[in-house]
Amino acid sequence: MSIVYLVSITFIFSVFKPITSCRVEECAAWFQKTKDYENLVPKATERYCQVLQTYLKCMNDTQRYCHGNLRFHSSELIMRRHWKEFECEKWESCNDNSHVKRKHVNTCYFNPPPSNRKLKYCSLFGDPHLIMFNGSVQTCSEEGARPLVDNRYFLVQVTNRNVRGEALTTTVTKVTVLVRKHNCTASLRYEASSDEEGLPRGFVDGTTFQMTSKHSVEVLWQDDNYVEIALHFIHSSIHIRRQGPYLSVSVRAPTIVLETGGDVARELCWSGCRKSSRIPAELAVEMTKKFAECYRRRVHVPKKVAEDRCKDIGNIGVFFDACVFDLMFTGDDYLVHLSRAAESDFRRLAPHHFQSHVTQQHARFQKENQHKNHINQSEIFKKCIPSKSIRFYPFLAIFFFALLSLLC
């Protein structure tokens, strides 16, 4: 009976174990990258103390998950010695109740402007199509909420749902941006939903910017269909567009900012869509009938008509392909305008990456076309609609608890 009990408890805890863990590696990585990026050396300077303070705050936040972690305790001890040795407390803001005049510190430091090579760009638009940080392009069909980008400074979460009632036809209907508390900003939240009449003009608390010597964060509202959330202190920006019942979102940020995140496997911009939800959009356009039958999709617009329409608005490359796919299988001109806006944003926000992206995609398409005649078309579209997964874990847990009650 004791063996059964132990096995059961072990199983249950393995299923429901918490996902939290010690983030000492993440804190150390951020600290080291910031030092390297700014050429900081350990000495009694205001900037080094400010970075050290942020590092110690990171360590303090993860302390309860690091009991018994030798690296955590040794690193924290060394850094606290630095804090004391360099008299970093003198750089802290003075107490409002104190009558002793101390040097007041401006704790908000803007990062140096990054070069084009150190900028990353990611975009999600249409039915939906994903351009990842590495330049890869995917077309997916996922429902529910998932982080697009998640790091120490901000989180962008997208919610996809089916708005047309057709199989595997999803699009972005909600974008949530969380700006995390930092020396340059308080915690801020922005929410955009396709159900609303237009994009909000500010954060949910009613503010539109964070005041420092210059605005560190601000909402740059253009009109009901386009808004930019600018994080000036880290040279990052989030761009949200709206067309009818659809939203699109793009993120531009330096690599050093993006790499302060934790589990990048969950982020769409880094790891992409789940394999089970990816759709071969290029083949779908070429083999329309087989795709439509396998994915239970209706062809709303003939291929030639869709191509002419997308050429008329000036789309090229992957944006042309996305436009054709969306128009063929939805017939919705709103998505045509979103693909055009997505291309325009890419050109404007990351021109260096846009040119290399077009070149790489052209080379990839040429290679794919060389092998297209060798593809066994009968093997491409099979079992396209995944069966609904059954979640066994809760039922198994209940079963084991019932078994324990009978045996004890």
Swiss-Prot record:
Keywords: Cell membrane, Glycoprotein, GPI-anchor, Lipoprotein, Membrane, Signal, Transmembrane, Transmembrane helix. Belongs to the repulsive guidance molecule (RGM) family. Interacts with unc-40 (via FN6 domain), dbl-1 and sma-6. GO terms for molecular function: coreceptor activity. It comes from the Eukaryota. Expressed in pharyngeal, hypodermal and intestinal cells. It is a lipid-anchor; GPI-anchor. It comes from Caenorhabditis elegans. Residues 23-387 are extracellular. The chain crosses the membrane at residues 388-408. Probably in association with the cell surface receptor unc-40, positively modulates the BMP-like Sma/Mab signaling pathway through interaction with both the ligand dbl-1 and its type I receptor sma-6. Regulates body size and this may be through modulation of the Sma/Mab signaling pathway. It is found in: Cell membrane. Residues 1-22 form the signal peptide. One of its GO terms (cellular component) is plasma membrane. Changing G68V: Reduced function, and only partially rescues the small body phenotype of the null mutant. This is Repulsive guidance molecule B homolog drag-1. Disruption phenotype: Smaller body size compared to wild-type. Glycans are attached at N60, N134, N183, N376. InterPro entries: RGM, RGM_C, RGM_N. GO terms for biological process: BMP signaling pathway; mesodermal cell fate specification; positive regulation of multicellular organism growth; regulation of BMP signaling pathway; regulation of dauer larval development; regulation of multicellular organism growth.
